[in-house]
Amino acid sequence: MKQRVLVASNRGPVSYQFDADGSLAGQRGGGGMIAGVTEGLVALGPEADVTWICAALSDADRVAAALQLAAARAGVREEGGIRVRMLDIPPDIFDRAYNNVANSALWFVHHLLFDTPTQPQFGHEFQRDWESYLTYNETFADALAQRAREALSGEVGQGRPPSGGPRILIQDYHLCLVPRMLRERLGGAARDVGIGHFSHTPWAPPDYYRMLPEQVGRALLDGILGADHAGFHAERWATAFVQCCAAILGAEVAPAGATWRVTYRGHVTEVAVHPLGVDAPALRERARAGDVQAHVSMLRAAAADRKLIVRVDRTELSKNIVRGLVAYRELLATRPQWRGRVVHLAFAYPSRSALAEYRAYTDRVRRLAREITEEFGTPDWDPLILEVKDDYPRSLAACAVADVLLVNPVRDGMNLVAQEGPVLSERGCALVLSREAGAAATLAADALLVNPYDITETAEALHQALAMPDAERQRRSAALAAVAAADPPARWLGGQLAALRS
């Protein structure tokens, strides 16, 4: 039977920009979630009927969305075998929903980022922002309901049974309310579709989650419990979610083998863990391309046979770049034997520059990098190379040449870099990994786990990684790569679809 899949996410698989002549140019959307979902959908094969609904994020996206409305299939455009529908949400609504609620409140709660003596402060302005978040989610629910009804009516017209109805995959904290809204819009037809929600972030424990206003916290949980299946990257995040459901909503929670069954408002939601790894063959093939190999040559020349500590992150508060740099400074201060023998490549992608906290954080990263270079650098040795720009080939090259990979988030839903590094490593890399990354659940056996807040422990782990015998480093790296390749995007997404079919 032909698979019908609807995907909904804030960011889509394609984004647009204006060329010099004013024409639209499309490019693949960025981010680990986009890559994972896209690769999983491609693995379904050409017979799958896939529509991806996303928000128009830029002026160019909004023009593209308007042009799509004139297409034969209103609002739908083909992109690499996936039909994409961009929703033109009013900019003020989008800004308040995305920046003020999703990124400034929900992201901070789930990553435990608030400076609690002064933050958060939920007042009348936040209530206005919350109304925008409601509107934003309603827009997605309306679009999904329309597409689901079209799919169901097509099946009835062609004599197909309703069990072949669409499976709907709703992504992340931007769209927590959509599952319940969609179920209410579909009414009785909801039994003929499968509604799934996946959280790519951690989930806050109940005591911290209660920081949100009561009606907001309850609405988010109730929204996700409108789904038939709710997925998380790691067991600890799924456990925190069901604990919140029990403590805050009074929902009935029961373990069911490797999953949980949460009963609320007469509906049962299955909560399960789906770790996301990497497509190792595709990743290695991409790394063999000329643009990546050119960066490999440049990085090796810059290192001049010195050992390389590599990090690849967004300039995101939770990625903990500042403490990572401080740990590197402590390594050089307390282990002088590494001076002149190691280079730290810190490659970062600009992130959320619309938020003042992120601009200040990026400035602090740049300032700290300068201080380390001024303190330890010599005429023939730059201890640190920091680049803050979007350069995917450079990032792949850095992973390929790394002797040590530093991944030290204060909290992370999964973290793909920790898995991509060992897969791409040419000589074997030692992984220094935060115990607070979701990936630690699968990679702990062969990584050097650290408390991301402990600078001294991180510096010592960097020393151990640098001093690790080649044979041990290569053995660990191979084991890490095997684990990372065991849960490729096709398996990750296929597991969710299978759960919805059951």
Regions from the PLM with identified roles:
Residues 1-502:
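Catalytic cores of carbohydrate-active enzymes across secretory and cytosolic contexts
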